[in-house]
């Protein structure tokens, strides 16, 4: 029978060096809170319960997680006094099952991988396992001291290390997998008899060794998995490290970046082969790119699906839209939520489309607003066409059937329908339905005054 798994996330720190009114764990990395990264990762495992220890800004932290992770059963425990990591875990004991095991994680160490946590859990065969790392410069970090047989016997802090111990390059990450029975046994015994007068979680290691427990240690695949965030410089550095990892994975899948250091992925991005991404492009949420997609500079693409062989020109914003194959977009186009562009359609410069469907091969080339509309196949929408969809209270639909032609600078006042192969003359204001194959115009008749003289200054 598999042992039950609890996750304890320590998220009580203020993050004074961030100089922010927002709790440190709510600072964002790749478009997601630091705490959100930890929750998403650990819940790729089979987790029975999650306990989050909160402190400074606890209401903000709870509100954020309740909104973003309402589907997760989370137990909240307050650490009213910041008395060290050992104390932070100790306050969870009233909520922690007596059996099973717990992963102890940190809300400001966001990039530990699911694979690493699974390996750490599997390594816990005698009551405790821990995540360590061998580094070139261990100064200031707790060293892992081993006996002559290679077993862990203690964690030595920098200030307590002798000259030999200071040469040790294996350091403690602070991430553990521990049997709950041992946590219930050891944590009440922690002492704050030290210079900082804090309760150190690392003290449970020497307690376990004294009980004859063999502590397993594993190392993560990447150094950044154990990097914490204490200030904005560290946050920015970790952001670039993570972006580099995301970009490298996409390059291996066949995506070409004009400059891998000048793109941001703030969510998940999957892409087909022979995709090109120019500089300054930002992806947010869940984005999917087909094969041979070409994205030029400065575009923002959020929660969108882009079909094969699409060309997105500079400075387009695409938000929660679905784009078919062979579509041309932009430059400076704005696709708002619930927009669908069918295959081989075209949306040109300074066009805004909201909650509308553009049919196969249809074109909205210049300076138009299309909202709450259904446009058929082979339709041409001229420059400056506006669908007037809002009367101040209600939104109404505009329907344009196949092969219609809408002349430039026309206003279509919804609700209205333009029939199949109908033509709307340029400059018209259309307030009534237009029959199929008809020509409709609604504008003042042109008059002309010959020999007209302009006013002159007196």
UniProtKB/Swiss-Prot annotation:
Gene (name only): glmU
Region (Pyrophosphorylase), start-end ranges: 1-232
Biological process according to GO: cell morphogenesis; cell wall organization; lipid A biosynthetic process; peptidoglycan biosynthetic process; regulation of cell shape; UDP-N-acetylglucosamine biosynthetic process
Gene3D superfamilies cross-referenced by the UniProt entry: Hexapeptide repeat proteins (2.160.10.10), Spore Coat Polysaccharide Biosynthesis Protein SpsA, Chain A (3.90.550.10)
Residues engaged in binding acetyl-CoA: 383, 389-390, 408, 426, 443
Enzyme class: transferase
Pfam families cross-referenced by the UniProt entry: Hexapep (PF00132), Hexapep_2 (PF14602), NTP_transf_3 (PF12804)
Entries under PROSITE patterns matching the protein: HEXAPEP_TRANSFERASES (PS00101)
GO cellular component: cytoplasm; membrane
Lineage: Bacteria, Pseudomonadati, Pseudomonadota, Gammaproteobacteria, Moraxellales
Subcellular location: Cytoplasm
Annotated segments matching region Linker: 233-253
Textual note on the cofactor: Binds 1 Mg(2+) ion per subunit.
Stated name of the protein: Bifunctional protein GlmU
Residues binding Mg(2+), per UniProt: 108, 230
Residue positions binding UDP-N-acetyl-alpha-D-glucosamine: 10-13, 24, 79, 84-85, 106-108, 142, 157, 172, 230, 336, 354, 369, 380
Organism: Psychrobacter cryohalolentis (strain ATCC BAA-1226 / DSM 17306 / VKM B-2378 / K5)
Molecular function terms, GO-annotated: glucosamine-1-phosphate N-acetyltransferase activity; magnesium ion binding; UDP-N-acetylglucosamine diphosphorylase activity
Known pathway: Nucleotide-sugar biosynthesis; UDP-N-acetyl-alpha-D-glucosamine biosynthesis; N-acetyl-alpha-D-glucosamine 1-phosphate from alpha-D-glucosamine 6-phosphate (route II): step 2/2; Nucleotide-sugar biosynthesis; UDP-N-acetyl-alpha-D-glucosamine biosynthesis; UDP-N-acetyl-alpha-D-glucosamine from N-acetyl-alpha-D-glucosamine 1-phosphate: step 1/1; Bacterial outer membrane biogenesis; LPS lipid A biosynthesis
Described purpose of this protein according to its UniProt entry: Catalyzes the last two sequential reactions in the de novo biosynthetic pathway for UDP-N-acetylglucosamine (UDP-GlcNAc). The C-terminal domain catalyzes the transfer of acetyl group from acetyl coenzyme A to glucosamine-1-phosphate (GlcN-1-P) to produce N-acetylglucosamine-1-phosphate (GlcNAc-1-P), which is converted into UDP-GlcNAc by the transfer of uridine 5-monophosphate (from uridine 5-triphosphate), a reaction catalyzed by the N-terminal domain.
Keyword Magnesium: yes
């Amino acid at each position: 029978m598999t042992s039950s798994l609890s996750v304890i996330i320590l998220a009580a720190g203020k993050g004074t060096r961030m100089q922010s009114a927002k709790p440190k764990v709510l600072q964002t990395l790749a478009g997601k809170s630091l705490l959100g990264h930890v929750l998403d990762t650990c819940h790729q495992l089979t987790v029975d319960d999650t306990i989050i220890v909160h402190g400074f800004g606890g209401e903000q932290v709870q509100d954020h997680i309740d909104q973003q992770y309402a589907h997760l059963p989370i137990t909240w425990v307050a650490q009213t006094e910041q008395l060290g990591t050992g104390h932070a875990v100790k306050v969870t004991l009233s909520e922690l099952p007596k059996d099973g095991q717990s992963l102890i994680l940190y809300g400001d160490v966001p990039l530990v991988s699911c694979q690493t946590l699974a390996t750490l859990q599997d390594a816990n065969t005698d009551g405790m396992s821990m995540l360590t790392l061998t580094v070139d410069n261990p100064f200031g970090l707790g060293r892992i001291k081993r006996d002559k047989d290679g077993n862990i016997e203690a964690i030595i802090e920098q200030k307590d290390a002798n000259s030999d111990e200071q040469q040790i390059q294996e350091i403690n990450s602070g991430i553990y997998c521990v049997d709950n029975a041992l946590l219930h046994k050891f944590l009440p015994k922690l002492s704050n008899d030290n210079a900082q007068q804090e309760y150190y979680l690392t003290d449970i290691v020497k307690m376990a060794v004294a009980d004859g427990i063999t502590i397993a240690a594993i190392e993560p695949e990447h150094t950044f998995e154990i990097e914490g965030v204490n200030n904005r410089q560290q946050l920015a550095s970790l952001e670039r490290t993570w972006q580099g990892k995301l970009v490298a994975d996409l390059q291996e899948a066949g995506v070409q970046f004009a400059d891998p250091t000048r793109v941001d992925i703030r969510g998940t991005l999957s892409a087909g082969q022979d995709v090109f991404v120019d500089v300054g492009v930002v992806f947010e949420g869940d984005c999917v790119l087909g094969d041979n997609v070409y994205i030029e500079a400065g575009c923002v693409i959020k929660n969108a699906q882009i079909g094969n062989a699409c060309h997105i020109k500079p400075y387009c914003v695409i938000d929660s839209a679905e784009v078919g194959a062979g579509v041309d977009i932009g430059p400076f186009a704005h696709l708002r939520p619930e927009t669908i562009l069918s295959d081989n359609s075209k949306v040109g410069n300074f066009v805004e489309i909201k909650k509308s469907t553009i049919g196969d091969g249809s074109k909205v080339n210049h300076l138009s607003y299309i909202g709450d509309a259904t446009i058929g196949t082979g339709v041409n929408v001229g420059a400056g066409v506006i669908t007037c969809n809002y009367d101040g209270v209600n939104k109404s639909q505009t329907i344009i059937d196949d092969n219609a032609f809408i002349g430039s600078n026309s206003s279509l006042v919804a609700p209205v329908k333009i029939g199949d192969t109908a033509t709307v003359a340029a400059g018209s204001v259309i307030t009534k339905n237009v029959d199929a194959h008809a020509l409709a115009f609604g504008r003042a008749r042109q008059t002309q005054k010959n020999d007209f003289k302009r006013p002159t200054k007196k």
